[in-house]
C-alpha cells in the first residue's frame, strides 16, 4: 500500500465531523461573568440551599483562592481566566419546572437529537435519566418507579433539601474540598448534578444515567454527583456528555463521589464525548474532573469503566480507596486522542483493608498530533495484608506524529501482598492493513476491526447500552484512518 494512500486515509479517519456540535437557540437566565463570594451566595440562594451548603461553598472558595494549579500533568494549554466564565446559566423559567411536560420544547428536541428522549412515549426502556442542561436539571425519568423500591434518584439540588441528612453526611467525605485545585473550585460553584441512594438489600431495577449538555458559549459546567450504595445493594450508573462546537475553550470541572458500604457494588460507566476542538486544535472543552470511590465496607466493590474520546484537554483519574476487608476496585479505560487533543488520565488504587483486590486495564489510542498519557498509582498500605493488584496498560499509535506515555507509581508496604504490572506499545503496521486489503476489507474497516479488538477487554465491561455506542463512536472518530 502506498505512503500517499496511507497518509490520506489517516487524515480522513481522524477528521470525521462532530455530530453533536449544534447549538440550541433558547432564552437563558445567567449570572454575570466572574467569581466572588457574592456569586457563590447567589448560587446557593437560587437553589434554596440549607445553611450547611453555603458554609461548604464558602470554605471551598477560600481554600481555592490559596491553591495553585497542578503542573505535573503532561498537558500544555492556555491559562484559564476564571473571571471570564459564567458560573450559572439556565434556560429561562427552568427553576419552576414541576414535570417534564413543563420543559421547553426546544430542550426536549435537543435531547431527542442526542438520542436521550425524555418524554413519556419515547423514554429509554430500563434506563432512568437525569438530563442536565448547562447549570440545571431539566428532567428526571422513572422517579416514581424507583421510589417504589426505595431508590432515591434526583438532581443534587433537590437532594440537599429533601435528603439533607444523607447529603450533609457524605458530601465531601470522599473528595474533600481541598483535595485539589479543580475539586475546590467545583465545591464552591457547583450548581447541579445527580444524587442517588440505594437502600439496604436492594438491587436497583433500572440502569441510572445522567446526561450532561453544555449549551451556553460563555458558561462552564461544574456538576457534582453523589452515589451511596447501602448494605448489600447494587447499582449501575451511566454517564454521557456532549457540547456545541465553539471557537473558544470552555471549562468543565466536575466531582464524582461514590460510597459503597458492606457487600454493596457500584458500577460507574462513562462515555465522554465533549467537543474536542477542530483539526487545528482550536476550541474544545477543558475537562478537569475528580472522581473517587470509597469501598467502605467489607466485600464492597466499585468498578469504573470509561471511554474517553472527546475534550481538547482531559485531566481525570477515577480512583478507589479500598478500606473494607476483601473489598474490590476496578478501572477499565479506553482513551482515544486525535488531531491536537491531549489526555492525561489514569487511576489510583489505595489498598487499606486486608485482602483487598484491584484491577486496572487501560487502553490508549493516539492519532494525529495528539498526546495520550496514562498515569496510575497503586499503593498497598502496611496493614493491607494479602492484597493483590493486576495492572495492564497498552498503547497504540496511529500515524507518525502522535505520542503515548505511561507513568506507573507502585508502592507496597508489606511483604504479604502482590502487584503485577505489564505494559505494551504498538502501532498499526502497513503489513497488517495489506492482509486485510487482500481479503477485500477496506482500510477503514480494517482499522475499525483492529481498534475493536484492542479495546475488547474494556468494552465487555460496559453495560449493553453503552458497549454498542462506544464501539460505533471509536469507529466514527477513526473512520478513514491510516495506512
From Swiss-Prot:
Which keywords belong to this entry? Chloroplast, Plastid
GO cellular-component term (any) = chloroplast
An example Gene Ontology biological process: iron-sulfur cluster assembly
Q: Where in the cell is it found?
A: Plastid, Chloroplast
Family label = Belongs to the iron-sulfur cluster assembly SufBD family.
**What protein is this chain from?**
Iron-sulfur cluster assembly SufBD family protein ycf24
Q: Which gene encodes it?
A: ycf24
Amino acid at each position: 500500500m502506498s505512503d500517499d494512500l496511507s497518509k490520506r486515509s489517516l487524515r480522513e479517519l481522524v477528521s470525521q465531523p462532530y455530530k453533536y456540535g449544534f447549538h440550541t437557540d433558547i432564552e437563558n437566565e445567567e449570572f454575570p461573568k466572574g467569581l466572588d463570594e457574592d456569586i457563590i451566595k447567589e448560587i446557593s440562594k437560587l437553589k434554596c440551599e440549607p445553611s450547611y451548603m453555603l458554609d461548604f461553598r464558602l470554605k471551598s472558595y477560600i481554600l481555592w483562592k490559596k491553591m495553585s494549579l497542578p503542573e505535573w500533568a503532561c498537558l500544555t494549554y492556555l491559562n484559564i481566566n476564571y473571571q471570564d466564565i459564567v458560573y450559572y446559566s439556565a434556560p429561562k423559567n427552568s427553576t419552576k419546572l414541576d414535570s417534564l411536560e413543563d420543559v421547553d420544547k426546544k430542550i426536549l428536541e435537543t435531547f431527542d437529537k442526542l438520542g436521550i428522549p425524555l418524554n413519556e412515549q419515547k423514554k429509554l426502556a430500563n434506563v432512568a435519566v437525569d438530563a442536565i442542561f448547562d447549570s440545571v436539571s431539566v428532567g428526571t425519568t422513572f422517579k416514581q418507579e424507583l421510589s417504589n423500591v426505595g431508590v432515591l434518584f434526583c438532581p443534587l439540588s433537590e437532594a440537599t433539601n429533601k435528603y439533607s441528612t444523607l447529603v450533609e453526611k457524605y458530601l465531601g467525605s470522599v473528595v474533600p474540598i481541598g483535595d485539589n485545585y479543580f475539586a475546590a473550585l467545583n465545591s464552591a460553584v457547583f450548581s447541579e448534578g445527580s444524587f442517588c441512594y440505594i437502600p439496604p438489600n436492594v438491587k436497583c431495577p433500572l440502569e441510572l444515567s445522567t446526561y450532561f449538555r453544555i449549551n451556553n458559549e460563555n458558561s462552564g459546567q461544574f456538576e457534582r454527583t453523589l452515589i451511596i450504595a447501602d448494605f448489600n445493594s447494587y447499582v449501575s450508573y451511566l454517564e454521557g456528555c456532549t457540547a456545541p462546537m465553539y471557537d473558544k475553550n470552555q471549562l468543565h470541572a466536575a466531582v464524582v463521589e461514590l460510597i459503597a458500604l458492606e457487600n454493596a457494588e457500584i458500577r460507574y460507566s462513562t462515555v465522554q464525548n465533549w467537543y474536542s476542538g477542530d483539526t487545528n486544535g482550536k476550541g474544545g472543552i477543558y475537562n478537569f474532573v475528580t472522581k473517587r470511590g470509597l469501598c467502605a465496607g467489607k466485600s464492597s466493590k466499585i468498578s469504573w469503566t470509561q471511554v474517553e474520546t472527546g475534550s481538547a484537554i482531559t485531566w481525570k483519574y477515577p480512583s478507589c480507596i479500598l478500606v473494607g476487608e476483601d473489598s474490590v476496585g476496578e478501572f477499565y479505560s479506553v482513551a482515544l486522542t486525535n488531531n491536537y487533543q491531549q489526555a492525561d488520565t489514569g487511576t489510583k488504587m489505595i489498598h487499606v483493608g486486608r485482602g483487598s483486590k484491584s484491577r486496572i486495564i487501560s487502553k490508549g489510542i493516539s492519532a494525529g498530533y495528539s498526546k495520550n498519557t496514562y498515569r496510575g498509582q497503586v499503593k498497598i498500605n502496611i496493614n493491607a495484608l494479602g492484597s493483590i493488584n493486576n495492572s495492564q496498560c497498552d498503547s497504540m499509535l496511529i500515524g507518525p506524529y502522535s505520542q503515548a506515555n505511561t507513568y506507573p507509581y507502585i508502592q507496597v508496604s508489606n511483604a504479604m501482598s502482590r502487584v503485577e504490572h505489564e505494559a505494551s506499545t504498538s502501532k498499526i503496521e502497513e503489513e497488517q492493513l495489506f492482509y486485510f486489503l487482500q481479503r477485500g476489507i477496506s482500510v477503514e474497516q480494517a482499522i475499525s476491526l483492529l481498534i475493536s479488538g484492542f479495546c475488547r477487554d474494556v468494552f465487555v465491561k460496559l453495560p449493553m447500552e453503552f458497549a454498542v455506542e462506544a464501539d460505533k463512536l471509536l469507529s466514527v472518530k477513526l473512520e478513514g484512518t491510516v495506512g
